[in-house]
Structure formats: structure tokens, C-alpha cells
Design a protein with these regions (language model features):
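Short amphipathic alpha-helix that is part of the acyltransferase structural core
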Residues: 2-64, 71, 81
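Short, P/G- and charge-enriched loop/turn segments at secondary-structure junctions
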Residues: 39-42, 101-103, 170
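Conserved catalytic-core motifs of GNAT/GCN5-like acyltransferases
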Residues: 150-152, 162, 167-183
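Conserved beta-strand in the GNAT
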Residues: 54, 61-72, 80-90, 94-105, ...
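Short hydrophobic/aromatic beta-strand element in the GNAT-like acyltransferase core
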Residues: 39-41, 50-55, 66, 111, ...
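Conserved GNAT acetyl-CoA-binding A-motif
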Residues: 140-154
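Conserved acetyl-CoA-binding loop-helix of GNAT-fold acetyltransferases
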Residues: 119, 125-138
Length: 187
């Protein structure tokens, strides 16, 4: 029997990853991330300056997963002191100690943020989201010269991101009823 971790990262489908228009991201962003809100809720003011990607399966014209990249600095902690985060998710019962604010944004290094990462529920757990994330992390590092990539992640997904090399930083916070934590990966 396979462990939960190998099941979670098992690749069941090989997706084709392509750059797409922001308009192609909206239906999936809306249906997966905020289905009870109007579609305009998933549109970002910076969408015009972002780079958007979709994961496609054979014989499908629409993406089954989407993600958007933006050049954006890491946020600094308000107080500049070490912060302890207690995260309890299905895959993690860990306490993470964050460094001081200088560890969040190294001087003169480019940071990239990914936002609005969504995968159709029927394709979650099949490796498509992992393929898409690995692809955009590579693109951020190679094409955008990113030293760090970060995101705001729902706390319920924190374990998934940790398995893929991201680490939480800063305190948790809310967007509406959803609890979030910032996560990052350094290259």
C-alpha cells in the first residue's frame, strides 16, 4: 500500500502547460476559488501585467488548472520581530518559526508572487496541480530571474505546498471566511 504522501504526488495525467490569457483563467478561478461570489471577485487589478498559465489535457480545449504570476515584493512583517506560526492542517502539525523581516526580502533580489491557483476538483490529487506549479516555479526562476516565489495560501492547503518545497512565513490572516498564510520558496 502506498503512503498518503506518494498518493498525493502520484502523477495520473501528463498535462500540457501553456501561457494563456487572463480571460481563460476566470471561469476556473471562479468555480474553484470563490464560487459563491460574482466572477468579478476573482479578477485582479494587476491581471493585465501578469503572466497566466493553464494545464491542458489531451482533447480538452479549456484548462483543467490555472495559475498567474506577478512581479511583487515580499511583504514585510509589521513589527520586524520573529513570529511563531502554529499550523494544523491534515498533513502538518508543525510549528514554524519565522526569521526577522530582513530574511523576508533580500536586498536587490527579485520576487515573484503566484495567485489564483485553481484546479478542477475532478482532477485534484492527480498530479496536474503539481506539474503546473513546478512549471511556473521554473519559469519564474529562469525567465523572470526570481530569487523567491511566494503566495497567500489557504491554511487548508498548507501541507500540500510544504510537500512541494514551500515554507510558511508571517502570521495567518483572513480573506473573508478563509484563513490564509503566506508561503515562499527560495532559489
Amino acid at each position: 500500500m502506498k503512503s498518503d504522501q506518494s498518493k498525493d504526488t502520484q502523477v495520473a495525467f501528463m498535462a500540457r502547460i501553456d501561457k494563456i490569457t487572463v480571460e481563460e483563467t476566470i471561469p476556473l478561478r471562479h468555480s474553484v476559488l470563490w464560487p459563491t461570489k460574482p466572477p468579478s471577485h476573482v479578477c485582479l487589478p494587476e491581471d493585465a501585467t501578469g503572466t497566466h498559465y493553464g494545464a491542458f489535457l489531451p482533447l480538452r480545449e479549456t484548462p483543467v488548472a490555472v495559475i498567474s504570476l506577478f512581479l511583487e515584493d515580499l511583504p514585510l512583517l509589521r513589527d520586524g520581530h520573529d513570529t511563531e506560526i502554529n499550523l494544523k492542517s491534515e498533513n502538518s502539525n508543525s510549528t514554524i518559526i519565522s526569521g526577522d523581516e530582513d530574511s523576508y526580502r533580500p536586498a536587490q533580489q527579485r520576487t515573484v508572487r503566484f495567485r489564483k491557483f485553481a484546479c478542477e476538483p475532478e482532477f485534484q490529487g492527480k498530479g496536474i496541480g503539481t506539474q503546473l506549479l513546478v512549471h511556473v516555479l521554473s519559469r519564474a526562476r529562469i525567465e523572470l530571474d526570481a530569487a523567491t516565489v511566494w503566495c497567500d495560501a489557504r491554511v487548508t492547503a498548507c501541507g500540500w505546498y510544504i510537500k512541494r518545497g514551500l515554507v510558511p512565513f508571517g502570521p495567518t490572516f483572513y480573506k473573508g471566511p478563509e484563513e490564509y498564510v503566506r508561503m515562499r520558496i527560495d532559489f
